[in-house]
């Protein structure tokens, strides 16, 4: 009997096992295509694509006597995004979907600011920053631990739970930002309207002065963290357990692994790192804000997946995404018709092509 089923004209399938050079070529092609589409849109907005991309990729530093300020701002955005992306990759590698980066970051920042406002003014700056970072890590880690415990004990969906916690964290931050009261240590005391105060001097990011350029110590910490995560995932028993659980929970159980313990431990570490990133962020920008995350919780998901959860790849992708974000803000100054969020469009096109 003849089979009358028609074959589709076009079949789209996900190709597995591609060689590294083909993957690199795919990524490069994705960026080129995204820039090409962006160029067409820039033309339609009466902007010069060549000049716009020049300003974007150089961060507006050419013939700029204040170029060091652009590099300082780049590092301010690069550090929290890189830490968050690395942290999310830990949970994602285990196929535990931590979508709560925004909330963990916000509450980590709030915890860090609490330490900054409460420690004596005489406390050493370096010690204060360490205490702030630890406080952010503990608060973030406890949120992650709560999420994982509810998942392993009651089967709570971690995606929905962490997503809802984002909004709870935002409302908590908003509450402290809008509640004028004597007990609220986060607000300016001399302002009629509620306004977040600058954190004390000893809680502000420690910097190494190199000429006019100020290098934030958080960058060094972050690069060390990259090395730690790489070794942790590829050279330790814990990293092996994460990979096995991610491949198959049943296989992990049959091999005698304590799956629940692995999930809780990894989720605690993931959320703790994001909380620490929040504390470092508030130390860097020197004030709390409901928008202090700059959407790193969401962008970090994109970065982690574009990098295929590889720590080294995450560094490269984070560097590119941060160039797009900071560069588009700089380029939009000279191209008035182009919004600074043009970077989001380019990110979306790249992600669409690769995934």
Predicted regions and their residues:
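Transmembrane helix-bundle core of multi-pass membrane transporters
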Residues: 166-235, 342
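Single transmembrane alpha-helix segments in multi-pass membrane proteins
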Residues: 40-47, 64-119, 133, 137-156, ...
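Transmembrane alpha-helical segments in multi-pass inner-membrane proteins
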Residues: 268-348
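Short, non-helical or kinked segments that cap or interrupt transmembrane helices
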Residues: 46-51, 92-109, 152-161, 265, ...
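Cytosolic-side transmembrane-helix boundaries in multi-pass membrane proteins
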Residues: 1-33, 39, 247, 254-261, ...
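Helix-loop-helix "hairpin" substructures at the membrane interface of multi-pass membrane proteins
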Residues: 211-287, 311-312
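Short loop segments and helix-boundary regions at transmembrane helix junctions
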Residues: 17-25, 45, 92-100, 124-194, ...
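Membrane-interfacial amphipathic/re-entrant helices at transmembrane-helix boundaries
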Residues: 7-85
